[in-house]
Swiss-Prot record:
Cross-referenced InterPro entries: Ribosomal_uS14, Ribosomal_uS14_bac/plastid
Official protein name in the record: Small ribosomal subunit protein uS14
GO biological process per UniProt: translation
GO cellular component: cytoplasm; small ribosomal subunit
Gene name, Swiss-Prot/TrEMBL: rpsN
Amino acid sequence: MAKQSMKNRELKRQRTVAKFAQKRAALKAIIASPESTPEARWEAQVALQKQPRDASASRLRNRCRLTGRPHGVYRKFGLARNMLRQAAMRGDVPGLVKASW
């Protein structure tokens, strides 16, 4: 199990990313637009840099929903490999069967 503080930190980051998503997208559009003036582009870059560091989506980490484990997490299920195995053995994951050949 991951520490509760790490889980809470990740939830706080998710909320921050969601809060600033539209504003970041607008600023990035100004920066990437070939029609924008150099001054507008510069102001957009400065405004983007002044936003909180955790507002960037690249700061998010996929964690297991049950344990908070940061590594070995399957995106499709949102579970770490060991929790996915336990859930599959219990039959909690529909359509997932143990491989045999």
